[in-house]
Amino acid sequence: MQPYAEMSTEELQELRKQLSAQYKEFQGKDLRLDMSRGKPSVEQLDLSMGMMDVLSSNDDLTCEDGTDCRNYGVLTGIKEAKELIGDMMEVAPDYIIIYGNSSLNVMFDTVSRSMTHGVMGCTPWCKLDKVKFLCPVPGYDRHFAITQYFGIEMINVPMTPDGPDMDMVERLVAEDDSIKGIWCVPKYSNPTGTSYSDETVRRFARLKPAAPDFRIYWDNAYGVHHLYDHDQDHLIEILAECKRAGNPDMVYKFASTSKISFPGSGIAAIATSRNNLEDIEKQLKFQTIGHDKVNQLRHVRYFKDIHGMVEHMRKHADILRPKFEAVIDTLERELGGLGIGTWTKPKGGYFIAFDSLDGCAKAIVARCKKAGLVMTGAGATYPYGKDPHDTNIRIAPSYPPLGDLILAMDLFALCTKIVSIDKILKDRADAQEAPEQA
């Protein structure tokens, strides 16, 4: 197809009329389509319903070490759950704390504890004049919401095909001791689907931060969330790399089963060094006597081991893969060659990142909404909701049924075409006016 930038103004105006007529047809369909969040579909949730049957009133809820899961105790989680999640996180069970149902909650608590009590004896962040976090962009809006809530200044770090711009990360953390952390989704990153390269992970491990309490917040939310059996991204293990590099305490690694079993009813965990674990446990013992051991046991008895979890994730992939491929197919068919957008082609995770022409993302999302399609708000993938170029849109294919998803993507492509034409025509009009004003 001919790039829009090469078409004459008259050709674009005529095409705009045709596209507007198609848009009015969509508006007349009274659509109610939702692609705003990366939620598992009903079909995916049904995959885990057998978990509701693995425990009954007749079952023995005693662990291998004799722990009665019905009672108080076991602050850091039952042994069996640590072994299962340890295999998922590629970390020995001794370096894991099993929490409740939300890894986001664990991350919030970790930042909150650093604010009020400091990290391993360092000054609490609340007593410092300035606290900063590095934020790879585009990134996860709920990460940014945590640091914004605590009044932490956020600094954008551009994402590359290999992960964050490590030249920038290395320079900033080395020269500024007010930088206390960086948010990372290292595998099938939200929203680009990028996985960090081996060299990027090793450069993270070799960081020389000015702040002794600097920590990498390594949210490996999509560690086992592949779309394909053989064509998969692989991530080297960050804690082992940090230990080899002489920085054993520099990483907090987070994960959960939210997009494996039931969102909001899974189990979450943190993996980190022994020093960090001891620091966390000092606070945790005042916060809780122990998390939901019955749910931990339920997960262990359902999945049995990492092999059972991997097989379960293949079923998720069978549902998700056609949806991701439908999105990519629509984008390539409708927008390929037009020069008005680029998009990622992830091998896993839950999102596809789309980048429009400068200054068009908000208008595209707004136009979609007027025709019945709700998407993630433009700008949400940047701190403070401010995309400096207004280009990035997060596409979440997981929740809608396939037929609705295809319809939604047809509408999205149509809105992208209309907004892009308007942008090109406006730029041309502005360019013509400029010499006259001069």
What annotation goes with each model-predicted range?
Residues 2-76, 80-81, 86-87, 370-373:
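N-terminal "arm"/small-domain region of PLP-dependent enzymes with the aminotransferase-like
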Residues 364-370, 408-413:
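Short amphipathic alpha-helices in soluble, non-transmembrane regions
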Residues 220:
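Walker B catalytic acidic pair
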Residues 61, 67-212, 223-246, 361, ...:
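Conserved core of the PLP fold type I
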Residues 353-359, 375-417:
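Conserved PLP-binding active-site segment of the aspartate aminotransferase-like
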Residues 314-328, 340-355, 369:
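Conserved glycine-rich beta-strand-loop-beta hairpin in the small C-terminal domain of fold type I
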Residues 99, 240-321, 334, 421:
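Conserved core segment of the aminotransferase class I/II
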